[in-house]
Each structure stands twice: as structure tokens, then as C-alpha cells.
Regions:
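N-terminal small-residue-enriched
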Residues: 1-478
């Protein structure tokens, strides 16, 4: 049987068992990662899995069942079991469950890829990490680490509404970090971010990062941080680099606009949300420079796809427009509860997990400035970049972030390097203070977004650029 035949058999079995709606996903995923430390290969991981996951809706209740077997008998049994779980749950009825309509697509989609990352010889990939980490050690790092990761995923999706979709998504990326120790301090510098850069692309992304070319600089900067002055405490103008702003978006916007959190359906890992649907369309989230979109169509970004795991097509939507909150991340059922006309943001971490609302590419639209112009316009402030620590409350409201590095900004010039820079604030007040935003957008990839019970790891993208925020508390000590 083909993968589509397996999924179709599961859906039909669920319908025969009483489901009013059913869908099934066959997923085949290959994963590879390699890490190096101090000029030597540390670990190689290669994994492959394939299986079937089935959802069934009976009354107001969902059921789910997954199996690592693609026979017709296993598929039919999975469909029946998903329907049986939903039927049992429906004995204690909850609120009605409706699904926002979507076109019944019959389609194929694939992410862009110039160089198949799994086709690159292991020796070449390992040599890259060995040379990069070895160079960092030669330039003074006490600990030099490098990593790449690759995911190669094919999905086949069938629904009782007529969907028949296959997608092939390649994701890869990597990065390096240098850690130096001395005088009671431990300092780290990373490239291109503290966890690397990732996208729905091929090995060409890793090549473009030039890990070896940046290795000496970040090792030397990690040592320089050991003797740099501490970031001063107080209120000042804060300039954030794009990588740090990407995490700020992830934590204080992305999770907050997940509709399942807003409705109180989900609280694991990141709590619920301070947002209230009665204020959708009217709440002032940030300054007029703040334009945030939900856009899974960005070529090469980590949160991109052709269709989500409910068969909804990838569509760009506004989340915040000119500072006003106007959109959410939603699934078909949560959107119906909220009276919205769209889903499109539901994905699962593999065939054995139930699809849930996840971030896609949630990020800022470009501003009118450059980083140099922002620095030139700042009389007294601090520039910070690359995340080191994060803390945010269970409403996604109060936060404190630490960065790897800071620089003093005085009279329009970047000055001394600062160590242990931190800043704190309250989400909407912080975003309302943004008064300059660069046009230099990069879709930063986050491959480790945790959510759900049992836990799932999502891959998300966050287009971001340097920006300035006024009168921010910095240098906060724990």
C-alpha cells in the first residue's frame, strides 16, 4: 500500500466507527546531528522513524491513536482506536466542537534545497566542526563547541473532507560557541546565535555561516569579556540586535498570541496568556513601528510549510498592525470557538503526537532605519545581542533577559564592551517604547520550542532586525 492508501484506510475506519470527522498523517523523518568539542568530534546521532497518527472527532471530543506500522490492518485498527477514544470521552460532553472550513486541497509541496544536507559526506561535515572548534581553542577559548542538525521529513495527509497532501521539508543549520573562564567569571560568545541558525533549506545555509571564518573572533571576544566592565544598572535607551529581538518576539509575542493559551486550553511549559479576545482589534500592543506577521510562506525560514497538519494552506496574516493586536495563531477548532475565520498554525512533532497550535514564522516587518543609524541617533544607551538567559512569567508578561555581550553607546558611537548585560520589562510597555527599527531583517530559526504534555519540540522562525527601546531597566542583578 502507498502512504496515501494507509492514511485513507485509517480515516475510513474512524468514520465507520462513528467519527464525524477524521484525519491521518503518515510521517517519515530522518535526523542527523554532529557535535565537536575542542577540535575533536564529540558525538554523531542518526535516527529514522516512520509511522501513522490518526485523529477522530466524535461529538465534542477528540481521539488520537498512533502506530509505527503502515499495513492496512494496522491503519484500520488505529482509526478504530482513535474513534473509540473520542467516543469514550464524549460520554462526558464538553462545549460543541466546530471546525473552521478550509478547501479540500489535493497538493504536493517541498521546501527549497540547493545541497541535500544528508548527501554531504560525513567527513566533510565533521571536518568543518573540527576546524572551527580547533581555531577557537587556538585563539584562547577554554571550551570550543560546534554543532549541526538536519531533519528530512516527508508527510502524507488525508482527511475525511477530501484532503490529500504530501510535503517534503528539509531543515538544517548549526553554529559554534566559545567559552572562556577566569577571575571567577565564565563568558561565552556564539556565532551566528547562541544556538545557531536554522532554516527550511539545504547545506548551503551552513556553508553561508562561515563558521571557521568567525571562530577566531568569537574566541577572542569571549576572553575580552572576562575583563570587560559590568553592564551598569539603571534606566537607559536599549538597542537590541536582531538575534536577541527574535527571542524577545518568541517569548513575549509568539507564545502570547497562541489561541489555545488565550482560551486556557494549554498551559504547559509557557503558561497561558495575558491577552483577552475581547480586546482583539483594539489592544495597543506596541508602538506604531510594531508590525508583526504570521507568515509560513517565507522561503527558507524555519517555520515555513505548504500546509499545516490540519490541511490548512500557508497564508501570511497580521498579528500586530501599527502597534495594534489584530491576529492570533490558531487551529480549526480553536478558531471556531473564538469566532475567527482562519486556522493554519497547527503542527505535530512527529507521527506519534497530537497536532497543536504552534508558532510558524512570527516576526517583525522591516523598519525604515539601519543599525548604524540607530546607534548614530542614540546619545546614551546600551547595545545588547545574543541571548544568554531568559525568564518570563506564566502570562507571558513580565520578563528578564540576559545577553552574551553588550556595548556602551555614547553620543552616537559604539564604545566599551560590557559583560553580563541584562534587561527587564513588561511586554506591552516594552513594545510601546520601540521608536527605531532597522530594515535589516533576518528570519532567525528556533529549533527547540517546547510545548505540550507529552512534550513536543517545535521549529519556529522569527524575522527580526535591530531596534531601539526607550527608558528600559538594564543591568538588573538576580
Amino acid at each position: 500500500m502507498s502512504e496515501f492508501d494507509v492514511a485513507t484506510a485509517a480515516v475510513q475506519a474512524a468514520l465507520d466507527a462513528g467519527a464525524r470527522y477524521a484525519d491521518a498523517r503518515v510521517m517519515h523523518r530522518r535526523y542527523e546531528s554532529m557535535s565537536a568539542r575542542n577540535g575533536d568530534i564529540e558525538e554523531l546521532t542518526q535516527d529514522e522513524s516512520i509511522g501513522l497518527g490518526v485523529r477522530a472527532l466524535v461529538g465534542s471530543s477528540w481521539g488520537f491513536h498512533a502506530v509505527p506500522e503502515l499495513s492496512e490492518a494496522a491503519a484500520r485498527d488505529a482509526g478504530r482506536r482513535a474513534a473509540a477514544t473520542a467516543t469514550a470521552s464524549a460520554r462526558v460532553p464538553g462545549p460543541p466542537v466546530d471546525l473552521v472550513p478550509v478547501p479540500a486541497a489535493v497538493a504536493s509541496w517541498a521546501s527549497g534545497c540547493e545541497v541535500d544536507p544528508l548527501g554531504v559526506p560525513l567527513s566533510d561535515k565533521g571536518d568543518l566542526l573540527v576546524r572551527a572548534t580547533g581555531t577557537m581553542r587556538e585563539h584562547g577559548a577554554d571550551l570550543a563547541e560546534g554543532l549541526y542538525q538536519i531533519w528530512d521529513t516527508t508527510k502524507w495527509f488525508v482527511s475525511s473532507e477530501g484532503h490529500r497532501i504530501d510535503q517534503h521539508i528539509r531543515e538544517c543549520g548549526g553554529g559554534i560557541s566559545a567559552t572562556s573562564i577566569g577571575d571567577g567569571e565564565t563568558q561565552r560568545r556564539s556565532w551566528p546565535s547562541y544556538r545557531g541558525q536554522y532554516g527550511t533549506t539545504g547545506w548551503e545555509l551552513v556553508t553561508s555561516l562561515d563558521l571557521v571564518g568567525h571562530a577566531a573572533r568569537i574566541a577572542e571576544e569571549s576572553r575580552e569579556l572576562l575583563t570587560a566592565p559590568e553592564c551598569p544598572s539603571g534606566e537607559t535607551d536599549l538597542i537590541l540586535g536582531g538575534e536577541q529581538l527574535a527571542l524577545q518576539i518568541h517569548e513575549s509575542v509568539g507564545h502570547a498570541i497562541e489561541l489555545d493559551r488565550i482560551l486556557g486550553w494549554e498551559a504547559a511549559f509557557a503558561g497561558t496568556s495575558w491577552l483577552d479576545l475581547t480586546r482583539l482589534g483594539s489592544l495597543r500592543y506596541g508602538s506604531e513601528l510594531m508590525n508583526v506577521t504570521i507568515d509560513p510562506t517565507i522561503p527558507g525560514a524555519l517555520g515555513s510549510f505548504g500546509f499545516d497538519d490540519e490541511g490548512s494552506p500557508a497564508v501570511k496574516r497580521d498579528a500586530v498592525r501599527a502597534g495594534r493586536w489584530v491576529g492570533v495563531l490558531a487551529g480549526r477548532d480553536s478558531a471556531a470557538v473564538a469566532g475567527l475565520g482562519y486556522g493554519g498554525s497547527v503542527r505535530a512533532d512527529g507521527w506519534a503526537r497530537l497536532p497543536m497550535v504552534r508558532m510558524t514564522n512570527v516576526g517583525l516587518e522591516p523598519g525604515p532605519h539601519t543599525l548604524d543609524e540607530i546607534i548614530d541617533a542614540t546619545d546614551d544607551g546600551v547595545l545588547m545581542d545574543l541571548n544568554r538567559s531568559w525568564s518570563i512569567d506564566d502570562k507571558r508578561l513580565n520578563f528578564q533577559f540576559g545577553c552574551e555581550v553588550g556595548w556602551e553607546v555614547k553620543r552616537g558611537r559604539r564604545g566599551r564592551m560590557l559583560r553580563n548585560p541584562t534587561y527587564t520589562g513588561i511586554g506591552p510597555l516594552f513594545w510601546r517604547s520601540m521608536d527605531m527599527l532597522s530594515s535589516e531583517i533576518v528570519p532567525w530559526g528556533t529549533p527547540n520550542c517546547g510545548k505540550g504534555q507529552p512534550g513536543q519540540v517545535g521549529h519556529t522562525g522569527h524575522p527580526a532586525a535591530p531596534a531601539r527601546f526607550r527608558n528600559v531597566r538594564v543591568g538588573v542583578r538576580a
